[in-house]
Amino acid sequence: SGPIGRVAANAGVPLVLQEQNSYAGVTNKLLAKKAEKICVAYEGMERFFPKEKIIFTGNPVRKDLLNAVSERAEGIAFYGLNANKKTVLVTGGSLGAGSINKAMVRWLEKIAGWKDVQVIWQCGSYYHKELEEQLKGRMPENVKFMPFLKRMDLAYACADLVVARAGAGTISELCLLGKAVVLVPSPNVAEDHQTKNAMALVNKQAAVMVKDAEVVERLGGVMERLLQDDGERKSLSEHILTLAMKDSDEVIAREILKIM
C-alpha cells in the first residue's frame, strides 16, 4: 500500500488511511502527512498521527457475524456438540499457531477430565497432519479437532470462551460478539503490535492475555479458572462488548464520500 498511497497523494488523489492496530505501522506513519483522513480503531492514536485527521471508526467485520450470538443451537448441531456443556473455541487462524497447538497437546489429558466442557480445536492446515499422527488414539471425546473452521460464525456462536491470537480483525470480531477471550499475541509480527492490541483490551478489563512464551505452561490453568468462574467470564464479555463498533464499514465509506 505504501507505493500506491504515495503516488496517489503526489498526483493529487485524496488519500484515506485505515490503521487497524493499536500501534501504527511504519507505512501508515509515513503516509500520514499526505492523508486527508486517518480511520483508526483504538483510542490514543494521536501518538502517531495528527489529531485533526483522526476519525474513530473501528475495523470492518464480516456481516455474517452479526447474527452469531443468536445461532448457538445451529452451531451446536453443526459441530456435533452437547448443548449442556460449556464450549471453548481454540483457534490459531487459518495456518494455525504453533505455540497454542503445543499448549493444547500439553494440556490434552487434563482437558479430557473436564466432564462439563467441550473444545473446538482449530489447529490450522499447516499443523494438522503432524498433530493428527502425533495424537492418533489420544484425542479426548470432548475435543473436536480440525484444520480449519467451515463456519466461523457458528464456531463463535457456540463458544463460552475463546482462545485466539490478537490480530486486529480477530479482536474486532470478538468485541462485536462480546466473547470472553484469552488472547495469545503472536511474537512474529512487526513492532509486537499484537501485544499492544491485547493490552488495549486487558487495560479495560475486556480480555485476559497470556504471553506466547508462557502459553504452553499456562494455558490450561487459565482456561480452567475462567470456565469455573462464570462471573469473570460475564465481566469480560460485558467489557469487551462496550468496545464494539457495528457499522465501521459504513462510517469509513461515508468519510471517503465526504472528500470525493
Residue ranges and their predicted role:
Residues 9-73, 81:
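Active-site-proximal region of nucleotide-activated glycan assembly enzymes
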Residues 24-27, 41-49, 130-131, 170-171, ...:
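Short, glycine/polar-rich helix-capping loops at beta-to-alpha or helix-loop-helix junctions
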Residues 71-77, 81-162, 194-198, 203, ...:
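Donor-nucleotide binding loops and adjacent catalytic segments primarily
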